[in-house]
């Protein structure tokens, strides 16, 4: 598989586990171009900070792992003006409201980063590698994403086909609610 992917937090954080899933490890080791959006960095840092309140030893281990990830040279995708504008359109869509705000009684409050990650995918025209398909499939129904790949299953759930097979065509995106 010679692809470029935007990593979702769940895929990156799988590598921090003591016994990561072998299928995810194989994906991370064989895909030559993996990109980390700043939204993922925020979620990882949020998780480490939350863990530090209850398990400082684990937080130190995760912090060391995070520093290793940062030194590994993964390209970091910053929130550019284009990403921010797309993110704003997605965040304003009432169909995606629960991804941005979440439910008051949810076990894990939402932080809106799946919508932010989708904005990166749309702006950069790159597929997302995720195991969190439900949220991204909802976004895809509203705003077709360039692709959703689940490395745990080694399966595409959404994949845009080229308009003309064998010919690269730059896609232009028009976002309207």
Cite the ranges covered by each PLM segment:
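Short, well-structured N-terminal submotif of metal-dependent ribonuclease cores
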Residues: 1-67, 170-177
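Short active-site oxyanion
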Residues: 2, 31-34, 73-75, 122-127
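Generic structural signal for small/hydrophobic residues in well-ordered secondary structure
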Residues: 8-9, 44, 87, 121, ...
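Residues that scaffold the ATP/ADP-binding catalytic core of kinase and kinase-like folds
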Residues: 14-15, 47, 86-90, 139
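A structural signal for well-ordered alpha-helical segments within the folded catalytic domains
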Residues: 42, 81, 85, 115-122
């Amino acid at each position: 598989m010679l692809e470029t992917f935007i990593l979702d937090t769940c895929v990156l954080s799988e590598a921090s586990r003591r016994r990561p899933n072998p299928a995810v490890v194989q994906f991370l080791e064989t895909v030559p171009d993996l990109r980390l959006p700043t939204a993922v960095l925020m979620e990882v840092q949020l998780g480490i900070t939350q863990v530090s309140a209850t398990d400082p030893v684990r937080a130190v281990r995760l912090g060391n792992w995070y520093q290793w990830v940062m030194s590994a040279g993964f390209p970091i995708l910053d929130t550019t003006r284009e990403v921010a504008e797309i993110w704003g359109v997605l965040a304003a869509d009432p169909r995606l409201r629960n991804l941005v705000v979440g439910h008051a009684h949810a076990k894990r409050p939402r932080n809106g980063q799946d919508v932010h990650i989708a904005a990166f995918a749309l702006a950069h025209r790159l597929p997302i590698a995720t195991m969190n398909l439900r949220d991204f499939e909802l976004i895809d129904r509203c705003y077709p994403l360039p692709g959703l790949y689940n490395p745990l299953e080694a399966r595409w759930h959404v994949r845009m086909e080229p308009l003309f097979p064998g010919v690269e065509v730059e896609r232009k995106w028009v976002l309207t609610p």
